[in-house]
Amino acid sequence: MIAQALISAFEQFLDDPAGVLPEDAINPAPQEFDESDLTDPALGYLSDDALPDPERGCIIGIIDDAIPFAHERLRLCNGASRVAATWIQDARFQPGGTGGDLPSGIELRGADIDVWLARARAGEIPGEDAIYRLSGVLDMARQTTPSTAYAAGHGAAVAMLAAGFSPDDPAGRNHPVIAVNLPPKVTEDSMGTLSPVSILASILFIITRARRLCRFIERRRELPAGSVRLPVVINLSFGLTAGARDGSSLLEQFMDAVSVQGAGDLGPIRFVLPTGNHRLARLHGRLKPGEDLGWRLPPDDRTVTGLEVWGPVRDGLPEDKLQITLTPPGLAGATTAFTAPWQFSLMKDPQGREIARAYYTPRYLGGGSWREGVTIIVMPTCPEHLSEPFAPAGEWRIAIAAHSPDAEYQLGVQRDEVIRGFHREARQSWLFDPQYRLYDEAGRLVETDAQNGGTPNVLRRGTMNAYAGGQYSLRAGAVDQKKMHLAPYCSLLHDEEGGDCLAVVDRAITQPGMLTSGRGSGSFGLMSGTSMAAPQFSRWLAQQLAAGESVADRDAIRSLAESQSDMPA
């Protein structure tokens, strides 16, 4: 399965059907990977004095945005880099450089980074900022968002929480880093339509380079072939708010398969993700046939708005397909008439212009089981140009058609927010049910469905990250430092827990955020969210695996965490 996914993901990434990459980032002729990385010093992963202990090391993989590989907390006291490899997916391709096997961008290995750091120490270049510019990671002349230039970015905070060590801390040497900088368009697209292929390719890069790093250690230490099998922890602080949440997406299935099957010449591979930040955002709901629910679309939204409907698990697809009824404000409703998978329906305004469409997207779960799904895409409520069609803002009504198969159907509104630092005129829509209470009589937030009372069709439970529905990925939630109380924004799993592990993120419920490292050494920022909990969990898990702890599955990791007093939260 890994081999098939490798071919598929890299082919899709090379074809770049979504236009994620600038044209000059594409590698026109990827080369076959050879053994030269074990013999050519210029292709080395780490200097000899930065190699981890083969018996007590654990590789930390990070997939994020604008990871500052030159940061002092990713170096040793002698100045050597702990970053074995980093792939900047959208950088301008450099023929003849490291990473000729990759479909795009550039790869910098430890040997490359050490050269840049040595030049900075010698005064040949001004410092870390110059390293990013001269290496091709940051190019202000290109038509992309220069997120690496931001003083305090998401990737910097995540990377240092997961793998940052003081240069004089000997523990850092046993945690080499393999990182991937996702293209800015992937980070900007909060709906996640562009991310699966990029993330899948990133996972495969980390696994491939982790295997090569182990072979590199064997060669440099003169150890038997196949004897070094370092474990790997991969942190993915990304997520979606709409999806099946049952582990059936390609990305979730792949992470589960890798967690179970691993790689024959590596130790265990574990994935850590945030639980999510949208418990109180009113993006998750339920409906039965014949019921309807409000869906509020704000004005001045120049992006499309998405919502997904998912039915229960069934033994085969029913003859009477799932149908939905959509009613825009001020217009008549329309009901789909799906008869076969992958069909779509269009909704038009009185002038005949398209304002929404619905796709019938059933998903095969294996063993003859299916889940019916419908994805709804509504046009922007504010067009870029006057001649373009647009959807009316206000309260839409969505219903499960009365003749649909009897069951409870799950609704998920897709995230549609402006990511800090990115210019995108998005506005978040939400579900509306009069029974849903934001505050109680005393003005306090209502944080659980039990506190809410009644039977609202907008829910707080089950609001977890839609990437984290697999059986083996680990979900990290956030608590505040003062009371160790689950953060109000922290999403809930299906069992209403805040995650498999909870980490301190906010200083108090009235003081959100924690101090995190910025892009430059010594700089800092203030960040909040479960994206800051996940790297703390990744760091802890990497330390446990390096110490030889056996954690075969999610329950074992939970048990280990609960047995240790030094566990975050």
List each language-model region with its residue ranges.
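N-terminal domain-start motif of subtilase-like serine proteases
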Residues: I2-I62, A66-G79, V137-A151, P380-P389, ...
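Subtilisin-like serine protease catalytic core
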Residues: L46-A201, L317-L322, G469-Y472, K483-H485, ...
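Extracellular S/T/G-rich loop segment that most often corresponds to the catalytic His/Ser-adjacent loop
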Residues: I88-R92, D114, A120-G123, R282-E372, ...
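Hydrolase catalytic cores
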Residues: A159-A162, P167, V180-K185, R209-L213, ...
